[in-house]
Each structure stands twice: as structure tokens, then as C-alpha cells.
Amino acid sequence: MAPIPYGEQAAFFRAALFLGLLKGERVVRWADAVIARDGSAPAGFIEVAATSPEDLTTLRHALLTVCGEKESAAVVRALLGAAGRDLSAGRRSFKDTMTVLKQLRASIAVDRALNDRLKTLGVDVALAGAGTGPAAAAEQRVREWLRERESDADAFLEAR
């Protein structure tokens, strides 16, 4: 598998920070590793590496020096995969995962088909009512849909 271009990886990290899918420490470690191995890495990596991992706003701004503002379809798929991994691993509750999906749909440009799918999943969960049989079925549909996307996050989450 070919390495992910720096701009794509930075776009993933930027959006993942916004959605709460990653911590700043992970992003700073990545920038440090890129600087250590690639003498021709874009200068923006120095700004990312020098940013406090706790200052997510500044970190996201620094990542913009490496990537564009619009996330590619591959980045969006990876974000969904990362959300699915967190849900499957128990790092995020179902309710919080639905909030992440809502934020993704509202804040990140997604294609029409994905927008419609996210909207349908959200409406199904909202209409089903908590603690009912239909709610369990709606939750299961979301879990299965996200599980199918988990591998899309692999290369982005394993970037060094």
C-alpha cells in the first residue's frame, strides 16, 4: 500500500480533532516523525510539531498549512471508520457516536448519497425511541453500517 500523501493525512487529523476522534498528542507525534524522516517535508510540519497538543484550535489551524480546507472522500470514509472503531471498542457510547455522525454531516462536505444515508440513520434512531425494540434495531443498523467502514480508517490511523 502506498503511503498517504501528507495533505490527506493532515486533513484526516484536522477533521478527527474537530470530531473528537483523536487527541492532539497523536498529531504532534506524527508531525515529529515526519520531520525526523523527511528533510523535504513542508514547513507547516514545524508549526504543527511546535503546537501544544492541548490547544486543538491552534493545532487544527497549523494543520491547514499542510492540507486544504475540504476533506476528500477517502478522508470522510476514514473518519467514519474511526468513529466505528471507537464505538466497537467501547471508547465511545452509541449516543456520542450519533453526535459525531451529526457533527460530521453538518460540518464536513459529504456527497449527497452519504448525506442521505447519515440523515436516514439519524432519523431512524431518533424516531425509534430509546429502550424499545425498534430502537435496538435502529442502533444495530448504525453499528453494522459503521463496522463495514472500520477498515477505511486503517491507513490513516497507522500513519507514522
For each predicted feature, which ranges?
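Acidic, Ser/Pro/Thr-rich low-complexity regulatory regions
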Residues: 1-160
